[in-house]
Amino acid sequence: MSAVPHLPALRRGRPYESLEKTQVVNHRTGEVMAEVSQIGAGILRKDLRAIGEARAALKRFTVSELIAISAKAGEFFLNGELPLGDKGHTQTADQYVATLSSTSGLPHVMVRRNMTKIHYALTNLGTVINGLSRGLPLDVIDRGFGEQSGAAVSYYPTT
């Protein structure tokens, strides 16, 4: 295992180690904390041409299932030990706070507050979607059509 974690770019859900990388450094000492793969516009355009594959992969799940997965991810983010990159590293929530604080200069308390906000957003995604969609039933998003307040409605994703 490398001493410095490498965070790959994700291309259609798969890790991708790019030739173009940037280093994340400790803002005080200059020590390299991680290496991050980056992709350019050309690769992004190429991946967008295959957007149908990504949509098909997501279609295997209902919106309710995706909301439940997001809530579980929020709990892991706030309380778990998660994989960090593709070289076998892991990171606890406390290590995340220390690393983000040392690379950004943000005080630990602000990093923790932001973590709490991310956790809240992920664990309350159903409420967020309900507000953004003005109460559109989730099965309408799943099927593409349905009924809301006695009126026929349809839904079609644009990207």
Across the structure, where does each feature detected by a protein language model lie?
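N-terminal Rossmann-like NAD(P)+-binding subdomain of aldehyde/semialdehyde dehydrogenases
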Residues: M1-T159
